[in-house]
A protein has these predicted regions:
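Secretory targeting and sorting signals
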Residues: 2-28
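Primary mode marks residue(s) on the alpha4-beta5-alpha5 output face of response regulator receiver
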Residues: 28-64, 71-195
Length: 195
């Protein structure tokens, strides 16, 4: 009788463990929800039906500008840390400019990167940099993984700050303007089906 109870108890524990494990796996596999709709100029599905978002990161950093000889600010490059949207506060990557190509790069903690070219620009509102849709040009696997390799599109959404100040500047000066935004990484239908 004790043996039967012990076996039943062990089976119950295994079943519950399996259910708990399944619940955790399901939670971890929850898909990223698109913040835009097909037809929206910032939505990749407008140009490539079947695309889906697979990663959403929050960025905080600066947009750097250099003052030109004519006394106006010219955008130089972004420098930002990337964070998951779960509120843990741990950086998982970085965002910067490839000075050779002039294109923005996102690098995940596994070393994988995506470099993209701007396709659509929409005003981010007064005092904010623009919202963007960028198309991947080059992706590379990192030494520790390939999280960003399947990226075909990158959205820059919900921008705050980052705009150069109004008015004249002293030639040769530089300025770093704080900004934050969300970057959403999209994969094509073909790479979505490969998973």
């Amino acid at each position: 009788m004790k043996t039967t109870r012990l076996i039943v108890g062990c089976i119950a524990i295994l079943v519950l463990s399996g259910l708990i494990g399944t619940a955790v796996s399901a939670q971890a596999a929850t898909p990223i929800t698109a913040q835009t709709e097909p037809g929206d100029p910032l939505d990749p599905r407008t140009y490539e039906p079947g695309s889906r978002p697979f990663l959403s990161l929050h960025a905080t950093g600066v947009q750097r500008y250099a003052c030109q000889a004519n006394g106006t600010w010219l955008f130089s490059d972004p420098v930002a840390d990337l964070y998951t949207q779960d509120g843990t506060g741990k950086p998982v990557g970085s965002h910067y400019l490839n000075f050779t190509t002039g294109r923005p790069v996102w690098e995940f903690q596994d070393g994988s990167t995506v470099e993209a070219a701007r396709r659509v620009t929409v005003s981010g509102g007064a005092g904010n940099i623009a919202s963007l849709l960028l198309q991947a040009v080059v992706t590379t696997a990192g030494d520790d993984g390939d999280r960003l390799v399947k990226t075909t599109w990158v959205q820059r959404l919900n921008p705050s700050g980052g705009v150069a100040p109004d008015g004249a500047c002293t030639p040769g000066n530089t300025i770093a303007v704080p900004y934050s935004t969300d970057y959403v990484f999209w994969a094509s239908k073909a790479s979505s089906e490969d998973e």
